[in-house]
């Protein structure tokens, strides 16, 4: 029997049975879940009603994540699934779905921050810089450009929770797209109250 999204196979509100008065219809069909995993990109196309296409992502390893407070969006690697409000099984099997909390690689955001503000981010005290990083952070600039960077530095403060994550090289992010429908795992970096909330949840889960 196929997966069906009808309601006439359920009992009535009064508890009585319903007699099926027609067979299953094409418009009542359902399809098996995509259960998108982390791995080299594998996407199937599905022909749907109206001749349209859906992109069923079976495996994904990168996504486009937006750092809201800094208006910076970068393509980055998805490392792990750490929390899912709807189902712990999806965390255990590392399944990518909408609104699951994942760890992403922080390198693209750190590179952007350091070139935009000319300030180090998430560096250990006294850590050696590579010549390229040295060039970006300690470059000789004209007075006019230096003034522009000094203006930017006034707003360069980021929260201590984010800074800790940058030191570990991984950021917590939330997936906002639907990988099994559009074939992408895009989302946003967690910040502020939302980040505090999910850190508490993850800690409570680990403590069990």
Swiss-Prot record:
<dbReference type="GO" id="GO:0003735">
    <property type="term" value="F:structural constituent of ribosome"/>
</dbReference>
<keyword id="KW-0963">Cytoplasm</keyword>
<dbReference type="GO" id="GO:0042274">
    <property type="term" value="P:ribosomal small subunit biogenesis"/>
</dbReference>
<dbReference type="GO" id="GO:0016020">
    <property type="term" value="C:membrane"/>
</dbReference>
<feature type="modified residue" description="Phosphothreonine">
    <location>
        <position position="130"/>
    </location>
</feature>
<comment type="subunit">
    <text>Component of the small ribosomal subunit. Identified in a IGF2BP1-dependent mRNP granule complex containing untranslated mRNAs. Part of the small subunit (SSU) processome, composed of more than 70 proteins and the RNA chaperone small nucleolar RNA (snoRNA) U3.</text>
</comment>
<keyword id="KW-0449">Lipoprotein</keyword>
<comment type="function">
    <text>Component of the small ribosomal subunit. The ribosome is a large ribonucleoprotein complex responsible for the synthesis of proteins in the cell. Part of the small subunit (SSU) processome, first precursor of the small eukaryotic ribosomal subunit. During the assembly of the SSU processome in the nucleolus, many ribosome biogenesis factors, an RNA chaperone and ribosomal proteins associate with the nascent pre-rRNA and work in concert to generate RNA folding, modifications, rearrangements and cleavage as well as targeted degradation of pre-ribosomal RNA by the RNA exosome.</text>
</comment>
<dbReference type="InterPro" id="IPR022309">
    <property type="entry name" value="Ribosomal_Se8/biogenesis_NSA2"/>
</dbReference>
<feature type="compositionally biased region" description="Basic residues">
    <location>
        <begin position="8"/>
        <end position="26"/>
    </location>
</feature>
<dbReference type="Pfam" id="PF01201">
    <property type="entry name" value="Ribosomal_S8e"/>
</dbReference>
<feature type="cross-link" description="Glycyl lysine isopeptide (Lys-Gly) (interchain with G-Cter in SUMO2)">
    <location>
        <position position="170"/>
    </location>
</feature>
<dbReference type="GO" id="GO:0070062">
    <property type="term" value="C:extracellular exosome"/>
</dbReference>
<feature type="modified residue" description="N6-acetyllysine">
    <location>
        <position position="37"/>
    </location>
</feature>
<dbReference type="GO" id="GO:1990904">
    <property type="term" value="C:ribonucleoprotein complex"/>
</dbReference>
<keyword id="KW-0007">Acetylation</keyword>
<dbReference type="GO" id="GO:0005737">
    <property type="term" value="C:cytoplasm"/>
</dbReference>
<feature type="modified residue" description="N6-acetyllysine">
    <location>
        <position position="128"/>
    </location>
</feature>
<dbReference type="GO" id="GO:0005730">
    <property type="term" value="C:nucleolus"/>
</dbReference>
<dbReference type="GO" id="GO:0032040">
    <property type="term" value="C:small-subunit processome"/>
</dbReference>
<feature type="lipid moiety-binding region" description="N-myristoyl glycine">
    <location>
        <position position="2"/>
    </location>
</feature>
<comment type="similarity">
    <text>Belongs to the eukaryotic ribosomal protein eS8 family.</text>
</comment>
<dbReference type="GO" id="GO:0022626">
    <property type="term" value="C:cytosolic ribosome"/>
</dbReference>
<keyword id="KW-0687">Ribonucleoprotein</keyword>
<dbReference type="GO" id="GO:0005829">
    <property type="term" value="C:cytosol"/>
</dbReference>
<feature type="modified residue" description="Phosphoserine">
    <location>
        <position position="160"/>
    </location>
</feature>
<keyword id="KW-0689">Ribosomal protein</keyword>
<keyword id="KW-0519">Myristate</keyword>
<keyword id="KW-0539">Nucleus</keyword>
<dbReference type="GO" id="GO:0005654">
    <property type="term" value="C:nucleoplasm"/>
</dbReference>
<dbReference type="GO" id="GO:0022627">
    <property type="term" value="C:cytosolic small ribosomal subunit"/>
</dbReference>
<feature type="region of interest" description="Disordered">
    <location>
        <begin position="1"/>
        <end position="27"/>
    </location>
</feature>
<keyword id="KW-0472">Membrane</keyword>
<dbReference type="GO" id="GO:0003723">
    <property type="term" value="F:RNA binding"/>
</dbReference>
<keyword id="KW-1017">Isopeptide bond</keyword>
<keyword id="KW-0832">Ubl conjugation</keyword>
<dbReference type="InterPro" id="IPR001047">
    <property type="entry name" value="Ribosomal_eS8"/>
</dbReference>
<protein>
    <recommendedName>
        <fullName>Small ribosomal subunit protein eS8</fullName>
    </recommendedName>
</protein>
<dbReference type="GO" id="GO:0005783">
    <property type="term" value="C:endoplasmic reticulum"/>
</dbReference>
<dbReference type="GO" id="GO:0002181">
    <property type="term" value="P:cytoplasmic translation"/>
</dbReference>
<keyword id="KW-0597">Phosphoprotein</keyword>
<dbReference type="GO" id="GO:0006412">
    <property type="term" value="P:translation"/>
</dbReference>
